[in-house]
Amino acid sequence: MQPTVSIAGVNHFFGDGSGRKQILHGVSLDIAPGEIVLLTGPSGSGKSTLLTLVGALRTVQEGALRVFGHELFGAAAELQRAVRRRIGYIFQEHNLLPFLTARRNVELALHLERVASDAGFEAQARAVLAAVGLDAEADRAPATLSGGQKQRVAIARALVHRPQLILADEPTASLDRASGLQCVQLMRRLAKEQGCPILLVTHDSRIHDIADRILRIEDGRLLPM
């Protein structure tokens, strides 16, 4: 079976000239459909940089990086956009639009992707909000939600269009244990039912048991645990 993500010998640099610094050193990794891979390691070790490269949010400088069978090194902007449309992103910052309710923030992802008719948007948004324990908060504005609730809305927004790959950067950082486990279990169910792999950056040892593999990055080098 072809891996959803295949990374071979990826190097990445920040800066120019004498200030150029290597962030990733020869990273190689395959992620199979439905596999959950956790990335751990100290801050500044390159975890988030690798995540954004896989998500076609940053240009691949050296090495090979294939997602859904498409090579991202040297890829045209149109191909990168097509790859991004098939990915669900969950970042540390929820980035909710303050003038939209929780439900409307989730619906917006469906409008942007055009994956359903307008009539089905509300039902899908309410269903995924209920799955993350926010059915009663669906029509509330972000300003009235706690930090943990806002993050759960962001997770719902990433999951609502049934992505083929989930990239998550510290998705449980602002959640208590119960809420964090609820959210990662939802992501795990999607991974196993839909064959949707997850690459998740975390410092949260409480969620290690959901992983198929746990890898560590130190000084830009990928290490097995």
Language-model-detected regions and their locations in the chain:
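Conserved ABC ATPase signature
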Residues: 141-145, 149
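Catalytic Walker B motif of ABC-type/P-loop ATPase nucleotide-binding domains
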Residues: 166-169
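Conserved catalytic motifs of ABC-family nucleotide-binding domains
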Residues: 162
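Short coil-to-helix segment of the ABC ATPase nucleotide-binding domain corresponding to the Q-loop/switch region
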Residues: 100-109
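Conserved ABC transporter NBD signature motif
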Residues: 63-71
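ABC ATPase NBD coupling module
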Residues: 18, 72-88
